[in-house]
Amino acid sequence: MLYSPRLTDQILIVAGEASADLHAARTLHELQRLRPGITAFGVGGPRLREAGLEALAPAEDISVMGLAEVLPRIPRILGILRMLGRAAAERRPRAALLVDLPDFNLRLAARLKKLGIPVVYYVSPTIWAWRQGRAKKIARVVDRMLCILPFEERFYEGTGVSARFVGHPFAERPPPGPAEAYRSALGLPASRTTIAMVPGSRPSELKRLLPPMLQAAERLRAAHPDAQFVVPVAPTLDRAALEPYLAAHRTLEVRLVDGRTEEVVGASDAALVKSGTSTLEAGLMLRPMVVVYKLSWLSYAVARMLVKIAHVALVNILAGRGIVPELLQGDASPERMAAEVERLLGDRAAREAQIAALREVRASLGEPGAPLRVAEEVLGVMR
């Protein structure tokens, strides 16, 4: 079936991992409110599908991080890229909203540019950290670059990229309440020491991070017999994906919660959090945390050569200094994780200093209303 841009308000949306799926879904809701009858097709996760996206492929098929992880998936990823190009050529959407996922989305943007389809790119690639030469390609294939970090718009000055800081989607969130309120909402005992563990939204992250997190939890339980551990299950994962890891720790009390990462962190006295968007999501809850991450040896070796920033945790990057501990690769051991969490549980001055710095980060994210501003940008470029 052929779709005429004169007869339908249809847009293409592509979002990969869980955070992008959430940001895109909120934007689609705003588009539907501003332009009743608008429809969307593309690639997204459960939240985008709930918002009405016609999903042509599942988000997890293109949401892969790390060179070693990407290589075996290349045929499938390229197949989806070609499929979306064909769908765009047939349906002729009036605009495309591409969210994060730069290695995939910039290639798709180039195809869309040849078709004359305007491209709005939401969540800038981290060109300020590595591969800065991508700015030239962005200038060629992206009509509007919408930045969610306050320093990114300035970075694009002089590159030919039409960029705008729209505020961070997390700025929508109200200030956090007391931990006891979140524990009550999650059905957790209010008086027990509570430790959140946020291992990520990808199977590869679970494989590398959840086992040492659980081993660290065993060590922490020895020091805190009343401790309870809570793990949010990302919307892109099924609980069954976690079961093999939990089976090795049957005596450890671990509560799984579907989604609700901010509530899980809000319920905690301290948290172990995977590096990435999760660190900002957790940081906005103003709870002490330790950031951890592991890549394959090949991916890590490549990253060390290319990355040009001092910190990897988003809250540290925004603060301009190391306000939360970062445990990477070999340092992300059960012993180090447990020791850093123990320090945050026992050292009141360290806790208060980290929380004060996280308040500053929260204040830097701009005013609420990012989904509305993104929707207005999409409508502004529609042919």
Swiss-Prot record:
Alphabetized GO MF terms: lipid-A-disaccharide synthase activity; phospholipid binding
Domain of life of the source: Bacteria
SUPFAM superfamilies assigned: UDP-Glycosyltransferase/glycogen phosphorylase
Pathway listed: Bacterial outer membrane biogenesis; LPS lipid A biosynthesis
GO BP term (any one): lipid A biosynthetic process
Listed HAMAP family: LpxB
NCBIfam families linked: lpxB (TIGR00215)
Name this polypeptide is given: Lipid-A-disaccharide synthase
Gene field: lpxB
